[in-house]
Amino acid sequence: MSYHGSVCVNDGQGLSIDPDRREDIAAHTLLAAYDLLEKWSTDEYAARAEFMNELEGYWNALPGSVRGQAAFEIDGRDRLISAYGDRQGKQSAWYFADRGVRPQEFDLTKLQSLRALYIHLDQLPGIPAHPHQLTHDFLDEVRAALSSHQLALWNELLNPSKNARKTNVLLVSVPRQAGGRSLIGVAFAARDREIDRHVPVFPLTARRRMASHMRERGGASLELMAKRVAVLGCGAVGSVVADTLAAAGVGKLILIDAEEYSEDNVFRHVLQPIYIGFPKTIALKHQLERRYPGLAVEAFNITAQRWLASTPLKGIDGVVVAFGAPSVERSFGRAFRSQEHELPVVFTWLEALDLGGHSVLMWAHRPGCLDCLYRDDEGAPCLHPRTSFLEPNQHVTRNLTGCAGVFVPYGALQARKTGHMAAEQMLGALVGSSTARAYRYWVGDGTQAQAQGLRTTPWWSRAPSTSTTVATDQAFGRPCKRCRGNS
């Protein structure tokens, strides 16, 4: 039940109603509210526990309540923190952070810096019930419940007010039976180291801007927070891979690409146009770290060959290679197999136009490598992969500005589908659900390719009706001297 008496009988998740049965809907809602109130009236302990589960919503409805944003961990560790507030402007702004920390996502330039105290209590006293409002009595009751350590922090909070009136903030967390902690607060004035009762108090609540909370609430894996993944090649496909890994919860990314972001890629790259002319890795670091709280990105504006030659792979949990250059990718596949460190490597590339995309997972020291794909039906080495959708020796590149502007035609949809597929394959390897070689692909309808007279392989026709298990066996089924010691 809210401060104003509203009763919530359903959270709305999965609720389906027939809008033509209005009387039945009203009757059902009223009966549900009655049953809920009757239930809590007979069990005071359970009612109190349920109320504390919903404390933040109740507090937010108190008269004069202001909602701020918290960037510190609500971990039950009593401490002095910092508050930044402005209740006089057109829109009230309040932020809370640990001392010495100025979160980059908050604009604090025009806000007053205030002293604040965060404490944790097992029970919250003095909660006002309608029609009563929050008063200084609440602070008195909280103060009476403080431990000796908390009381010392309280005195330290008020100490600067000995010479002038100061605005202070008290934030209190209490346990929720449903898990976690509720956080509420109050802003008040102090003078001569005492609460100034001439200045009204007002309630505070806070949106949680901590990386841990937003990750868990937003569906990002906390298990992946410690994982470190390198993405080699940050073009249209590689940038989608990086963005998807970050959104899934991977906490550390290493981005390697020597090129600048070009206006030619605006419609198929995750970067915004404001980054045109900047190194792609630097721009992605800037954009992704601001997009995904808690993410740490290492950006290398160098060639992948140079990076690999100077960087030990120990400490890296996975690598995604998104060059779209088969010869270069094969050389990297061999380089990874020569390393002592075992790790999963995903190679991903696009076919021209709307034919489809591919993603291959290999492990550095296990059977199955990129060279396995470069075998003909007899098992002999060949120049083109068995997985190709396009027959070899066809001209598919275009250029609009001369030789320097040559590109392979494909669109944003194709790049995103391929990038998501490769990222999903890497995520499976990181969490242990994919522990062996694997080949994944998607097949487009080929309308554009056929309109341009391009010839497709028999595999492109068979692929839609072939399971990924069978496709993986076919892709890696030929003898390979690189990964299995025979030819």
What do the predicted segments below correspond to?
Residues 1-10, 24:
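Compact alpha/beta protein-protein interaction domains typified by the UBC
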Residues 218-260:
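Glycine-rich adenosine-cofactor-binding loop
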Residues 307-315:
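Short amphipathic alpha-helix with an adjacent loop that forms part of the alpha/beta core around
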Residues 178-229:
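N-terminal charged helix/coil linker that caps or initiates catalytic domains
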Residues 29-46:
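Ser/Thr/Pro-rich, low-complexity mucin-like regions
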Residues 258-293:
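Glycine-rich phosphate-binding loop and adjoining beta1-alpha1-beta2 segment
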Residues 290-308:
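S-adenosyl-L-methionine
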Residues 48-192, 314-318, 322-487:
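Glycine-rich phosphate/adenylate-binding loop
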